[in-house]
């Protein structure tokens, strides 16, 4: 196994954040940091013990420019003792997703189409997750965020372009929550080029087990482009839990694109079917068997090819290797100049 730098952040998960009591779904949560010395630690490859690190203090991703000073604002990655975590390995059905209005030239504004849309089984997944977390007997559950980073990477490698920490959550009994969600069939596998080989292997094993679970939702995964249902919207916090039955759901990555496509077509901002939309976007990914052998030098394929994929998704979820968008964290330096954080 290749040597890595290990990052860990001790904190607590506030269970009240999850739907129906809150708005969090099954793959993005907020980890409430214990604001005390030693909460954020790193163990470099050549070290045997974890050491405190201040790499993330007052650091963040560049935001909008201040309209008064003209200086670029920094969106802190640790804000008021809280980090936002994107659970790596998984993609859960969308509990609330708004169409991406970029590129519509304002054509979506005022149309009433920008709403929080929802997928079938999103509620079921998060309700089952909360039921499991409640077995630990605390509404504020102690845990650790962990991320294994390549030695050539700096602190920014743990952060995605939205300022979220990307990694795993380890529960008090040592359970890896990310793998548990896959094993229970409560999420779809999502593999990225930033993941280490062993992480890919154990994720696939967990996903394959989860697809066999009769209690999970993975068995209801649908690789066909079902008709978009605009009546499925986010149900407000406090709503009663409903049985979603055996209604199938599309891969969340494709659903997000389908939601935006639908809004654009309704606003007459795009002419064509969903396949046309995907073809125009020309997003690319790697094929896992080839990526294992050649890494990022492997051929990149379009996310969708009408000729081969027809009205659905051509590969299995575990065949896709998606590219993690490059990100870095910065601080405001002298004179408001942005300075990249590269050292631990």
Predicted regions and their residues:
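Small beta-barrel nucleic-acid-binding modules, primarily SNase/OB-fold domains
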Residues: 1-344
């Amino acid at each position: 196994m290749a040597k890595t730098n290990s990052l860990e952040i001790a904190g607590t998960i506030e269970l009240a954040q999850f739907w129906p009591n809150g708005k969090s779904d099954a793959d993005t949560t907020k980890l409430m940091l214990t604001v005390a010395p030693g909460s954020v630690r790193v163990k470099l490859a050549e070290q045997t013990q974890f050491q405190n690190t201040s790499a993330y203090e007052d650091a963040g991703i560049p935001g909008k420019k201040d309209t008064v000073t003209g200086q670029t604002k920094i969106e802190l990655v640790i804000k008021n003792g809280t980090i936002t975590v994107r659970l790596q390995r998984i993609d859960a059905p969308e509990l609330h997703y708004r169409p991406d209005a970029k590129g519509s030239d304002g054509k979506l504004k005022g149309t009433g189409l920008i709403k929080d849309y929802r997928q079938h089984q999103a509620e079921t997944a998060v309700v089952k997750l909360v039921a499991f977390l409640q077995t630990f007997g605390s509404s504020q559950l102690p845990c650790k965020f962990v991320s294994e980073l390549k030695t050539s990477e700096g602190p920014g490698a743990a952060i995605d372009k939205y300022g979220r920490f990307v990694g795993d959550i380890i529960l008090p009994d040592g359970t890896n929550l990310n793998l548990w969600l896959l094993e229970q069939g409560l999420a779809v596998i999502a593999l990225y080029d930033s993941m280490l080989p062993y992480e890919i292997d154990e994720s696939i094993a967990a996903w394959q087990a989860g697809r066999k679970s009769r209690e999970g939702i993975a068995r209801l995964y649908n690789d066909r482009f079902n008709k978009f249902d605009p009546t499925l919207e986010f149900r407000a916090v406090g709503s009663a839990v409903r049985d979603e039955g055996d209604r199938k759901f599309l891969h969340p990555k494709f659903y997000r694109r389908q939601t935006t496509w639908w809004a654009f077509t309704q606003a007459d901002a795009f002419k064509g079917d969903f396949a046309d939309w995907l073809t125009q976007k020309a997003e690319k990914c790697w094929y896992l068997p080839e990526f294992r052998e050649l890494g990022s030098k492997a051929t990149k394929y379009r996310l969708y090819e009408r000729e081969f994929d027809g009205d659905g998704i051509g590969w299995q979820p575990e065949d896709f290797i998606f590219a993690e968008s490059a990100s870095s964290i910065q601080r405001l330096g002298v004179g408001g100049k942005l300075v990249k954080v590269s050292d631990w």
